């Protein structure tokens, strides 16, 4: 698992030419409902300061539970899950 904040991990995936953003997706807590999760491909997001965007929808970084590679390897995981 990579170290750093989720924003740092996503920036590396999106902007490092050695990475392919199509190989990753996010698992987010959808609408704050515990257990209601949504999968979002990283290539569909734009990074912001305290939020990321999917189209015009603004989602706070703290709702990201995991960053996962297509092969199922978890790259980053929220402390909420690690407890």
UniProtKB/Swiss-Prot annotation:
Protein name, per record: UPF0248 protein PH1212.1
InterPro entries assigned to the protein according to its UniProt record, in alphabetical order: MJ1316, UPF0248
Pfam entry (one): MJ1316
Biological source species: Pyrococcus horikoshii (strain ATCC 700860 / DSM 12428 / JCM 9974 / NBRC 100139 / OT-3)
NCBIfam families linked: PRK04257.1 (NF003272)
Cleaved signal peptide residues: none
Coiled-coil regions, chain positions: none
Family the entry assigns: Belongs to the UPF0248 family.
